Swiss-Prot record:
InterPro entries: P-loop_NTPase (IPR027417), Small_GTP-bd (IPR005225), Small_GTPase (IPR001806), Small_GTPase_Ras-type (IPR020849). The gene is Ras85D. A lipid is attached at C186 (S-geranylgeranyl cysteine). It is found in: Cell membrane. Keywords: Cell membrane, GTP-binding, Hydrolase, Lipoprotein, Membrane, Methylation, Nucleotide-binding, Prenylation. Its main location: membrane. The keyword Nuclease does not apply. This is Ras-like protein 1. It catalyses: GTP + H2O = GDP + phosphate + H(+). It is an enzyme of class 3 (hydrolase). It comes from Drosophila persimilis (Fruit fly). Belongs to the small GTPase superfamily. Ras family.
Length: 189
């Protein structure tokens, strides 16, 4: 069974824990209790493959930012979560993305942009803005509501598909690099 290490990142209060708990336990947590770091595991079937999701729910508060590099090193894929009612949380996404790329020392890292709290009537981040940023980053965009469960499975499952795609691409590049080149015989006189 394949294990996927998923990391949920974003500013404080965007609903990272609520999304994770909704996926794992099928219920909505409506009280806000800032997370330092929580880890969850769940066995699921995605596209016919049974896999184990190892999900790290991270601290959004700035005082825990020193811990970020460590979990970014171990994560295979990242949910970049913002709240649709918070323009600031949307602006912070770029910082998280750049930090992930720096820590992973890679231009392309499996990520999914997640606009959470879509059940709210007031949105300060328009759908088009989020889609445009996701397009610039070359990553999928999923709208979710931890409260109604809308898009929750889709967000996590899409991230697993992005990780698989990334592994396939790296495998193909590796095979191309390992092909023997035409060899010429040399004679030393």
């Amino acid at each position: 069974m394949t294990e996927y290490k998923l990391v949920v990142v974003g500013a404080g209060g965007v609903g990272k824990s609520a999304l994770t708990i909704q996926l794992i336990q099928n219920h909505f947590v409506d009280e806000y209790d800032p997370t330092i770091e929580d880890s969850y595991r769940k066995q699921v079937v995605i596209d016919g493959e049974t896999c184990l999701l190892d999900i790290l729910d991270t601290a959004g508060q700035e005082e825990y930012s020193a811990m970020r590099d460590q979990y970014m090193r171990t994560g295979e894929g990242f949910l970049l979560v913002f709240a649709v009612n918070s323009a600031k949380s949307f602006e912070d996404i770029g910082t998280y993305r750049e930090q992930i790329k720096r820590v992973k020392d890679a231009e392309e890292v499996p990520m999914v942009l997640v606009g959470n709290k879509c059940d709210l009537t007031t949105w300060n981040v328009k759908n088009e803005q989020a889609r445009e940023v996701a397009k610039q980053y070359g990553i999928p965009y999923i709208e979710t509501s931890a409260k109604t469960r809308m898009g929750v499975d889709d967000a996590f499952y899409t991230l697993v598909r992005e990780i698989r795609k990334d592994k396939d691409n790296k495998g193909r590049r590796g095979r191309k690099l390992n092909k023997p080149n035409r060899r010429f015989k040399c004679k030393i006189l």
